[in-house]
Every structure is written in C-alpha cells, then in structure tokens.
Amino acid sequence: MEINHDYRVKLFDELSFERKQCTECNQWFWTLDKDRTTCGDSPCDEYSFIGSPITSKKYTYNEMVKEFTNFFAEKGHSPVKRSPVVAKRWRDDILLTIASIAVFQPWVTNGLVKPVKNPLVIAQPCIRLNDIDNVGRTGRHLTCFTMGAHHAFNSKDEYKYWTDKTVEYCFELMQRLGIDGKTITFIESWWEGGGNAGPCYEVITHGVELATLVFMQYKKVGNDYEEIPLKIVDTGYGIERFAWASQGTPTVYESLFSEIIEKLKEDAGIPEVDEKIMAESATLAGLMDIENVGDLRVLRQKVAEKIGMDVDELDKLISPLEYIYAIADHTRCLSFMFGDGIVPSNVKEGYLARLVLRKTLRYMEKIGISMSIKDIIAMQLENMKEIYPELSEMKEYVMDVLDAEEKKYIQTVNRGRGIVERMAASKSEITLDDLIELYDSNGLPPEIVKDVVDELNKKGKKTIAITVPDNFYTIVAERHEEEKPEEVVSTKKELPELEVSETELLFFKHPTQAEFEAKILKIAEKYVVLDKTLFYAEGGGQKYDIGQLNDIEVSDVQKKNGIVFHKVSDISKFKEGDTVKGTLNWENRLKLMRNHTATHVINAAATRVLGKHIWQTGSNVDTEKGRLDITHYERISREQVKEIERIANEMVLSKMPVNSTFMDRNDAEQKYGFTIYQGGVVPGDTLRIIEIEETDVEACGGTHCSNTSEVGYIKVLKTERIQDGVERLEYSTGMGSVSEIAIIEDTLIDSAEILGIPNDQLPKTVKRFFEEWKEQKKTIEELQKKVGELVKYELADKFEKVGDYEVLVEQVSGTPNELMSIADNLAVGNKLIVLMNESDYLLCKRGENVELSMKELIRNIGKGGGKDNLAQGKYSETKEQITEKISQILNK
C-alpha cells in the first residue's frame, strides 16, 4: 500500500513551527527557530548542554522518573508499575526487556488482550547489550536505561488520542522542565520493529535526542504494509538523558553515579581528569555518531588533536576512568538482572548476566579496585531503593549469587592458562571464533587469553597471532540476546488438520467426575474427536488420561488447535454422529492429580527455602513420579532438600484449599504478578489460575486435587544438576512415596546384612571401610610407581632409533594405570612410547621434544583418542605390525 503520512500537527500550526530540510543530512524537521538550518541532532549539531544545563533546575535520576510520571498522570494517564527486565517472564521470543512497548507485546499489541490501563504512563528499566563495548567510552552509552513512555491504544470502539496530543504533551513537558522551545526540533522519521511500523518524530534539543514518538499503525508484510486495527501511541523518553541534560555533566555517568564513581576513583587511586577532556570526548563522540567501537580509536585521536596531547598519553590518562564509568553502569545493570531473579548460567538470560558480571570483574582487576563487587552493588541498591524498593528486597539473593559467581570466575581464570596453552600448541593463530569458543565453553575473557598468548610468544619457539576485537562482548551478546525457539518433537505434529469446533473440556467444571457422554464429531485415522470430554490431553508437563470409550481402551490423548484427539484400540467400533460413553481410569487420574498438585507445593516450598529468584523451567507429571526443574545458582544441599520436603509435607498436613478460577489476564497479572507464568507462557485473554491459599499461584491448565491433604506424603527422591543454573527435583506422592521409602529401607537393610552389622552402624562402618580403601589405594599407587621405575630400567635398552626419535613398542603385563605409570617414567625428551597389555589396551605417550600428535598416531595403529601428548584406546594387530606402521609414519 502507498503511505503518505502528513507530519503536520495542530501544535505546529498554532505556534507557527516551520518545516525545513537539514543542510547537513537532508532530513525534514520542524522548528520554531526561523534561522535554524540544521536538524539539531548530532552529528549535524554538537552537544551544547555539557557545562550548560538546559532545564530550569537540575534533576537526579529519581527526580526525573517522578517528574515524568507525575506530568502524564496529571494529563489523565494511569501510572503502571514497571515489569521485570527479564522479558522471558511473559513472552518467549526475547530474553530481556528492550523497550517499554515490549511489556505489552504480543498480547496487547496484537489485540488479543486489552491494555491494563488506557492511556497509561510507565518508567520501564530496559537492558540492551548491543552497545556494551561502547559503555564508558563514548560518554552516553548505557547497558541499562529507563524508557519513560506514555502509551495510548486506539481501536474503532475506543479512541484516546493520536499525533496531535502526543506532540503537544511532549512539547509541554519539555517546556515545563525549562527547555527553550526554540531549541527543540521534531525530525520526521519512520520506525519499524517486531513486524510493525509507523511514522515517528525524533525529538532533539542541544544536539541530543531526548525522545522518540512512534505512531504504530502498520504491519509489515514482505515488502509491503497493511494497516492494523489497533493504532498505538508508542513513545520513548530517555530518562537518563533528561537527567544528564539537566545537570550538564561531562558524561551521562556523572549524572547517574557520581557518588559511586568518586568512591571507585579513590579506591583505585586514579588521579582527577580535567572535566574539559571528558566533555570534549563526549561532544566529539556525538559528532562522530559512534555506533561501533572501531570508531573509538579515531575518536581518541581527534580528542588528542583538539586538546594538544599525545594520543598515548591521553589513552593512559582517561582509560582507567572509562573503566570506572563502565563498572558503574554494569553494576546497575546487574542490580536489575539479579534483583529481578536472573540466575547466571551458560544459556539464555543467565548467559547474558554472567557476561556482564565477568566483564565487570575483569575491569575491576584491570584498574586494581580492592573493594568487592558486592560493595558496589550494595550502593546501587541503596541508591535505587526509593524508586525500586523491590530490588533491595532481593539483596540477600543478589549477594549470595555474587559470592558464588565470583568464586567460579576465579576458578575459571586459574584453569584458563592450561586451556589456552593446549589450544595454542596446535595453532598459529587464535581467531575470533577461537576466542568465542573459549568464552562460551570455558568462560575465559579474551583479555586473559591474550595475556597467556603474549607470554607464550615471548618464550616460545613460534609466534601465535591473536587480535581481540574492541567489540568482542557486543559480538557474543548479540549471538545470545535473541531467544531462539527450541525444536520440539511432538506427536501433535502427526495429528490431522480438522475443521470442527473446539472440544469442550469438562474437567474444568467437573474435576471429580469420571464418566460422561459425548457426540462423535469426527473419526480421524486412529483417533476419535468428540464435542466434549473429561479426558485430559497431554500438555503443560502432565501426562494424558487413559480410560475407555464404549468399553474400548483409550491409550493416548492429544490436543491440537483446541481439538482433543482420543486414540482408541479399535477405531472400527466408532462412527461419526454416534453418542459414546466415556469412562476415566480414575486411579490413574488421581495419581496425576496428586503429582501435579505436588509440583505446585514443592515449587512453593523451594521458593521459601532457596529464595524468590527460583523460576520453574520445566516439569513432568506422570503417575508414578513427578519432577520439577528450577533455576538456582548452586547445587541444592542435603539440608535444603530436607527442609523443602518438610515444608511441603507441612502444607499437606495443613489441609490447604487448592482453588481454581478463570481470570482476566490483566487482573491476574496485577493481582499476582508475573510469577503466575512459572509453568510457561500462557496465551489468551483469560487465564485459569490455580491458587494454594497464600502459598502458590500459577496459571495452569492441568488437573489438581481440591485440597493439599489429598496429595498424601511427599518424598523428594533426588536432585540433580541438569544444566548450569538449573536444578531438577524428582519426587513421589501418596502410596508412591511409601513404595520409594520401602526401596530405600530394603537397600539399607540388605547393605547392613552383607556387612554383618546392625542398621544403625551402617554409616560408621561404610566410612571406616572407605578410609581403609583409600589407604590401600594409596599403597597400591606407590607400588605401581615403584614397579614402573623398575620396568623403566628393564625397557631402557629396548628403544629403537626411528628417524629423529627413540621409539619403544612393547607388550607389558599390567592394568592401564600400571602402564601409565611406566610410560610416565619413560616419556622424556625425544622418546615415543607405545605400550600394550594382554587385554587389548593401547597407550601412546610422547616426550616433550616429540612433535607427532599421539591422538593422530593412535588412530593409525588402533582405535582410540586423547590429546597431542597422550592417547589411549584398543589395538587389534600384532606388535610387529604396529611397529612397522609407526616406522612408516615417522619415515615419511
């Protein structure tokens, strides 16, 4: 469709704004200044607010949040609480909250759900890591920023306001702050994102963009656009930039973190830097319109030329301060990440949090900051307490996770040297892909890799090339920032597409009913489709119900597009239009109800024991057992498991009602928060809420008991770490728990009988045996070492000269450990050892002067693998044949 948007609004006519074209960038803009020739934005105009605040008073960040919110509240907008910075809490396509409109996507923006208020105002903290390497260096970039926004959602039934009022509000707010109207320009522009599009204004003053006013009204379809029924006012005001411009500080960081910056400078012993230098750097950065770190070296050169200083001296002077700026920004970002419950890991949002944390720790090391990162983040939490008290409520978790992650980082760095040395041994260059692999797989920052390689180059026989891109962290963050949908292999894909009405689910209204009658709408292959059913279809982690239709077994139940498919053992017994009688296997259903209710109970208990940060990442409810996967930053201890189990059973004994209600999505979110999505994102404007009174509330479509007492005894059977940052709890309920306890008891009794001791003596006896075994193992290892030394002399005369190396190929009696001990004694210098035992075990080991890879050698003479200096496997040929093959390889 052809789009001809008129950017003229009522305010422009009333105040006699003029439309002009920028002489520098050719963009069209509106201004009150009849003499203006440029659009006002950088790089067409330089920052003119540094050292010269543009508002009638100076605003702190907290004051600016309040001023912005109060202004729009006075204009009839309902203030809405911020959402978490973890967008995964309510949507599954992005990990972090990157804009205020993300809070209302996809349900509100696509018209499925009404907005919680209309119009509304929100000050939404956002995180974007696509500029993380620019932070601290340009004077304006932040990883964590607050997008002030007023949104209006206009439909044919409910119209609020559009372009005229939006521009009027913006201009009035800026004048209320004391900004001269003649300095404000409205640049005509176009916005696209998330499949939507619309015209917009970029609102500029004194060289800096303070707001963007978007009018979302189109859907992008290929290269064309379609008008959408919901017209959305989507504005974004940079709260931090408003505060910066009101204070006129050299960089945005002083306006936000002045107290923290001063403490860090004092701690690191960094001398004062002339504010004019930092102001010049920030101003020139604006003129250069820096969007990639490659331009930063050019920026440094330009600043040096402008102030008449050598570029290396300038770099030495301001780099430490730039690190401090970055630390201040990153610790605020981490305060939101951890305060909103992110658990560090090697995937998804946990990966991004760990990236920011380790980058911060590296910078702290680099400039010698002695205070802990916990101290810095404690200051951040205190500073934000007035606006975001909920972050301080999570302080205990934040401090605990920082402790755990700092220890992991130190361990990573300590083992990093060996990892890098092994990689460098077989390479002439450490590439960007190598650096990313070392970071992703081993957590090694590129700076540490470079330090190790530089040391190797100084004392090594060869030179290994390495270049660390200035934007390394941006590159790795962008690879992980977007959520990629996981491929799920499901039986639902095999189900046919049908044009019948959705199946009425009777178990919501009649949770204890076991029999029903229904009409057959369709016979689809091996499935029967009914107009209504009591059978629960597999979903939400819960297994399907089983039972009968007209005495014919129902062995599987699936759902697709709201239609329930019943798999029966004899499809020939059914025909469309017939009425059938359905009967559930009630014992099976009861077990599923108990185990599903137990999932909620254990989740609530785990939250009390481990903390509010835990988040359900998956569950599986079967008849015999259930399992729950939750985020947590360390292994769950035995004592914590016992406490979780105790609290869970206390809830069972307390006979707590389990209530099921259907609620409007907005009402549920406002009442309970985003924790209702613990079980996963639920579509639609109406949610089924399961509430265990004052304990656990979740949006859930499964079958549950009506009271916790019906669950029976809960036994946590085991926990395991299924991936970094995720713990799995496996449990049983009722008679299942009795059976599991009996198995454990039998194991203990059998073990005690084998040892011929009473049950209560088992732990002490096992401990004694274990200590004795360790002593014997130590003695055996010492004997093996002595045997190896003796065999060394026996084999010393059996080496043969092959090419440049002394080669030993020998069959030796002994275990793999004994052969390893022998090889350790012999593999020195230019010696190459190949040992075999009578069990087909094969060992290849080389001395430090042998360049041939043992991993490659073993593949040529047998089967196996290993490293360049040591390989193990199996052999099938004779000693003579293996010797001949080695000679051929070495004499090539």
UniProtKB/Swiss-Prot annotation:
InterPro entries: aa-tRNA-synth_II/BPL/LPL, Ala-tRNA-lgiase_IIc, Ala-tRNA-ligase_IIc_anticod-bd, Ala-tRNA-synth_IIc_core, Ala-tRNA-synth_IIc_N, Ala-tRNA_lgiase_arc, Ala-tRNA_ligase, Thr/Ala-tRNA-synth_IIc_edit. This is Alanine--tRNA ligase. It comes from Methanococcus maripaludis (strain C6 / ATCC BAA-1332). It catalyses: tRNA(Ala) + L-alanine + ATP = L-alanyl-tRNA(Ala) + AMP + diphosphate. Its EC number is 6.1.1.7. Zn(2+) binds at residues 596, 600, 700, 704. One of its GO terms (biological process) is alanyl-tRNA aminoacylation. Its cofactor is Zn(2+). The gene is alaS. Binds 1 zinc ion per subunit. It is an enzyme of class 6 (ligase). It comes from the Archaea. One of its GO terms (cellular component) is cytoplasm. It is found in: Cytoplasm. Signal peptide: none annotated. Catalyzes the attachment of alanine to tRNA(Ala) in a two-step reaction: alanine is first activated by ATP to form Ala-AMP and then transferred to the acceptor end of tRNA(Ala). Also edits incorrectly charged Ser-tRNA(Ala) and Gly-tRNA(Ala) via its editing domain. Keywords: Aminoacyl-tRNA synthetase, ATP-binding, Cytoplasm, Ligase, Metal-binding, Nucleotide-binding, Protein biosynthesis, RNA-binding, tRNA-binding, Zinc. Belongs to the class-II aminoacyl-tRNA synthetase family.
